[in-house]
């Protein structure tokens, strides 16, 4: 959950950069600037659960039930939602459709993002098959690997290409984001290439901390380190 909150905060900040200069966009930008990264992460979780409620035909919910879905208290839910200008009605709660639309507007869910994935190993395969990206407005423009045996194969609807094609695809598809699922010894070189090709943000799953130019949007996700932190929390709860 902690990494997902960091990721959502990073995405929201990039969405703010994409905001238009009309008055409505300015209001949303002001609200985004006031939200903490943990609050943004929780809003994204509420958004996910609200869409599940909509799919199930539910029309209303309340802070107690919504909090139980994402493991936070009703008071935290009410505080988060009041911070984006959404106030529930006592005894009635929140209209699911209206609340989902409100949170989506704040998170910038209407912005469409294109990403490329480099490294189609076990983790890369799982990421390519994950359908949750599309719900939040992300599409995978291409996937790359250095193994010729994988070239031309389709994984989750995306065709795997040679890493030699990277610059060509970056120039034509113009994706904004890159997901790195490569070995640590390859990560720095790949990061340099994608940034030179116009990528604005990197989600790095390689077990190394990348050094990138100032102002570059990057999140380093080390799954082993996350497990260490989880073990620490269990030992010290």
Curated annotation (Swiss-Prot):
The keyword Transcription regulation applies. NAD(+) binds at residues 119-124. InterPro entries: CoA-bd, NAD(P)-bd_dom_sf, Rex_DNA-bd_C_dom, Tscrpt_rep_Rex, WH-like_DNA-bd_sf, WH_DNA-bd_sf. One of its GO terms (cellular component) is cytoplasm. The keyword Repressor applies. GO terms for biological process: negative regulation of DNA-templated transcription; response to redox state. It is found in: Cytoplasm. It holds the Pfam family CoA_binding. Transmembrane segments: none annotated. One of its GO terms (molecular function) is DNA-binding transcription factor activity. It comes from the Bacteria. Residues 45-84 bind DNA. Keywords: Cytoplasm, DNA-binding, NAD, Repressor, Transcription, Transcription regulation. Modulates transcription in response to changes in cellular NADH/NAD(+) redox state. Belongs to the transcriptional regulatory Rex family. PANTHER family: REDOX-SENSING TRANSCRIPTIONAL REPRESSOR REX (PTHR35786), REDOX-SENSING TRANSCRIPTIONAL REPRESSOR REX 1 (PTHR35786:SF1). Homodimer. This is Redox-sensing transcriptional repressor Rex.
């Amino acid at each position: 959950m902690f990494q997902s909150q960091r990721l959502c905060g990073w995405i929201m900040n990039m969405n703010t950069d994409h905001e238009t200069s009309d008055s409505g966009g300015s209001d949303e930008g002001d609200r985004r600037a006031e939200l903490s990264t943990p609050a943004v992460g929780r809003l994204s979780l509420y958004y996910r659960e609200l869409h599940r409620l909509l799919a199930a035909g539910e029309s209303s919910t309340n802070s107690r039930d919504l909090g139980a879905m994402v493991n936070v208290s009703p008071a935290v839910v009410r505080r988060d939602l009041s911070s984006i200008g959404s106030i529930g009605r006592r005894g009635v709660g929140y209209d699911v459709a209206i609340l989902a639309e409100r949170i989506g507007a704040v998170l910038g869910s209407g912005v469409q993002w294109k990403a490329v994935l480099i490294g189609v190993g076990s983790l890369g395969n799982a990421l390519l098959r994950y359908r949750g990206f599309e719900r939040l407005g992300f599409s995978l423009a291409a996937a790359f690997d250095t193994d010729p045996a994988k070239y031309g194969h389709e994984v989750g609807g995306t065709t795997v290409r040679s890493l030699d094609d990277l610059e060509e695809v970056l120039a034509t598809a113009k994706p904004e984001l890159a997901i790195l699922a490569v070995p640590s010894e390859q990560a720095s070189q790949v990061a340099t290439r994608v940034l030179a090709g116009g990528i604005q943000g990197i989600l790095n799953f390689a077990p190394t901390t990348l050094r990138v130019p100032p102002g570059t949007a990057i999140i380093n996700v080390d799954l082993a380190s996350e497990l260490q932190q989880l073990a620490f929390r269990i030992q010290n709860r």
